[in-house]
Structures are given as C-alpha cells and as structure tokens.
C-alpha cells in the first residue's frame, strides 16, 4: 500500500456554483503527525498489527511515512492517549486494547469544563442519582453474600473515619465504589470513579468543622442502604439511596453558598 499517496492529496477544483454561494476561505491543513496517527490507527484497527505486537521503530516509521521524528512521536503519543498503544522507555510502542478507563479519560476534560457551566454540577448530580439508583437496585437483587460483606466492611471503615474529614471522604468514595463493583461491569466502574472524581473536584473548600454533622448523617444513610440490600428490597434500597444523594447535594449546595458569602 502506498501510504504517502494519502499525504500528497491535491485539492479538487470547486464547482463554480459553490464559489458563488460561499465566501472563499482557506481549508485547514492537517499536521503531519495527525496524518501519521490516522494511518497507524487504521492499520491497528485492520489488525495489520495485532494486540501485544510491537510497532516498527521510530526510525522505520520516519522512513515509511517520510516525516521527521517529532511527527512520529506526536502520533504515537496521540495513539497512547486513545489506549491503542503502550509506550515504555527504551522499547518500541506496543499495540494495546483501549480499556474503559481510557474511554472515560478522553471525556474528562470536557466533563470538567461542563461542570463550570451554570447548572453543570446539578446535571452531573442528576446523572449520579440515575446511575447509582440502578446500581443499588441491582445490588439488592443480585449481590452475593461476599459482596454484602464487602459493603459491611466499607461501612465499618466509614464509622471509624467520622472525626477525620479527609479519611471520611476516602471511606465514602470506597463505600460507593464497592457498590459500583457489584455488577462486575468495568465500564460501570470507570464511569463511577470518574463521576465521583469530577463532582468532588467541583465541591467548594469548607472548614472540617462544617462537615462533621454531614459525615455522621451520610454514615447513617449508608447503614439504611446496606440494610435494604441485605433485606433484598430494591425499592427500599432505591429510596434510601435517593434520600442519601439528595441530602449530599443539598448539603454541598448550602456549604457552597455559605462559602461565597464569606468571601
């Protein structure tokens, strides 16, 4: 295959009617690194390079595409971000398969930007409510005894962290992570981890003393959720979860307003 033909394309003459209806403007030219990236991606997706197989060396890729080393390195870095290759120091890039974490990380920048828009946090809180509502209903119907034991252990750690806000936040995240693990779906896990990371990062900074009562309430609400799961009652578990997340949202909105007034 003559790869370079795609890199030397000529612009076609525009129809006269198009020229009359549109103002002339230059077409954006693709960078060489983007062209190399696209071609390598297509090769990988066509299985010309299999999973776990090493790509040609940088020097070989430079010669093959007739480009410089920076273009090759930029292309490989872009493929790494997409999860299509792994790059270890001193080794040639190796073809890999994108994971759920890779997919979510590609969305992370856009998600964090959206959170800064008016209503952005509320939209993500609603997404979390819909998502975890399904998780808790599934847990009430399908969680194994071992998985319920893990939830119980997470509750114990929760209770031991009430007087330390940083520890409580970690134990709170861990409790919800155990809940998200129950279906055994790696995409659920990746979404859940990212969603909590985005929401926690968007929360205002408040003194620890402001959170002690909130932490106690969250812990008590976690107990109700686990009890409903133990009872195999999805409706009760769902109600408990919604009460908990609505309470969390209300608390942080109130703390955020209070923090703004104090500035």
Swiss-Prot record:
Could you provide one GO biological process annotation from this protein's UniProt record? negative regulation of DNA-templated transcription
| Matching Pfam families | FCD, GntR
Q: Which residues form the HTH gntR-type domain?
A: 30-98
Q: Which residues form a coiled coil?
A: none
InterPro entries according to UniProt: GntR_C, TF_FadR/GntR_C, Tscrpt_reg_HTH_GntR, Tscrpt_reg_NanR, WH-like_DNA-bd_sf, WH_DNA-bd_sf
Q: Which residues bind DNA?
A: 58-77
Residue numbers spanned by region Disordered: 1-25
Q: What does this protein do?
A: Transcriptional repressor that controls expression of the genes required for the catabolism of sialic acids.
Its name, as the record gives it, is HTH-type transcriptional repressor NanR
This protein's gene is called nanR
């Amino acid at each position: 295959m003559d790869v370079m033909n795609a890199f030397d394309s000529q612009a076609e003459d525009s129809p006269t009617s198009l020229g009359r209806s549109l103002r002339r403007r230059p077409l954006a030219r693709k960078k060489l690194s983007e062209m190399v990236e696209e071609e390598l991606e297509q090769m990988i997706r066509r299985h010309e390079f299999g999973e776990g197989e090493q790509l040609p060396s940088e020097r070989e890729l430079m010669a093959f595409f007739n480009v410089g080393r920076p273009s090759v390195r930029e292309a490989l870095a872009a493929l790494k971000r997409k999860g299509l290759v792994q790059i270890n120091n001193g080794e040639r890039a190796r073809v890999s398969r994108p994971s759920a974490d890779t997919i979510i990380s590609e969305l992370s920048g856009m998600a964090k930007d959206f959170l800064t828009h008016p209503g952005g946090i509320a939209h993500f809180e609603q997404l979390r409510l819909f998502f975890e509502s399904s998780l808790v209903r599934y847990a009430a119907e399908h969680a194994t005894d071992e998985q319920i034991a893990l939830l119980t252990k997470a509750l114990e750690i929760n209770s031991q962290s009430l007087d330390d806000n940083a520890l409580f936040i970690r134990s709170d995240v861990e409790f919800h992570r155990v809940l998200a693990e129950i279906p055994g779906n790696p995409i659920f896990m990746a979404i859940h981890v990212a969603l909590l990371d985005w929401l926690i990062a968007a929360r205002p900074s408040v003194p620890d003393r402001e959170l002690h009562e909130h932490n106690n309430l969250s812990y008590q609400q976690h107990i109700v959720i686990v009890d409903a799961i133990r009872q195999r009652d999805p409706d009760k578990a769902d109600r408990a979860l919604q009460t908990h997340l609505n309470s969390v949202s209300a608390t942080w909105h109130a703390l955020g307003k209070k923090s703004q007034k104090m500035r």
